[in-house]
Amino acid sequence: MFQTRVTQLLGTEYPIVGGCMMHISTPEFVAAISNAGALGMMASAMYETQEDFREAVRRVKSLTDKPFGVNLSLFPALRPIDNELYVEVILEENVPVVETSGHRPPEDLLARLKAAGVVTMHKCVSVRHALSAQRAGVDLVTVFGSEGGGHIGELGLSTLVLIPLAADALEIPVLAAGGIADGRGFLAALALGAEGVTIGTRLLLTEECPIHPNLKQALIEARETDTLPILGTLHNTLRAWRNEAALKVAELEQQGADMWAILSVAAGTNTRRMLQDGDVNAGVLACSQGVGLMREVKPVAEVIRGMVEEAQEILQRWEGTTNRGTN
């Protein structure tokens, strides 16, 4: 059940992708997601040198024989990123899947990857951008609703509206992202026309996720109202968990502060301190509204399997109700 073009293209057991998360998607975490039947996704931008990235790719390969992917960020960055260095490793190490996010993926990059047999994905926040990626030649797209954690764009379109629009407009498979945290959301995304889902925030509350226990406990206690969009004044809107750092960023933006003042709070160094040391107010954490549906820490495999099993149970209940209604 739930075999779609996404599972065919990615070679996964389930049509589920574990979204890459900066500072969090370690090789061990990525491999755990892939071993659970989903697609683990590395964040190439976590690695400052080609050697470090190659070592991380090899570490993933040593921990799983299942497919995994690498995200290439095409967003503007304060630290210059030479994606060519990552691409060389991807091709040399036979990485099976590459996801791009941010600007439209260059056609020459896609051609090189596809010539090597790499499955290509693009993550975007609008139908227009998804169509552009399809024209560029990607194999599938993840379309990201505004409920999601991370870069949600400026349009404010919800997953409920965005996914059927994308599914109607595109010929390639669509994955839904944004606020999906259980089997109900997974099944709803398929009903809307998606052929799979990308989840991120839900995976923060897993045993394998390498964030501090203090932060996991804080997320357990969080509600669906405990997120907010920030960085809109930098045209890089991000939905974040509502902590002191995120509220400070929002305050600075309201005051008309310059980019450097804002980034001094939203800096990745602060986020790393939060993730590693457990100071839950030290930095900004991307977080979806789906955090309100999360109440306990489980193994990754249990989260993935539970999502699929819950969706199956819902279908069985529907089938039983329909059968009773026709007798």
Spans of features found by a protein language model:
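Acidic, glycine-rich active-site loops and adjacent beta-strand->loop/helix elements
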Residues: 74, 147, 179-180, 202
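Conserved active-site-proximal phosphate/metal-binding subdomains
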Residues: 152-175, 181-327
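Active-site entrance/lid segments in N-terminal catalytic domains of soluble metabolic enzymes
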Residues: 1-169
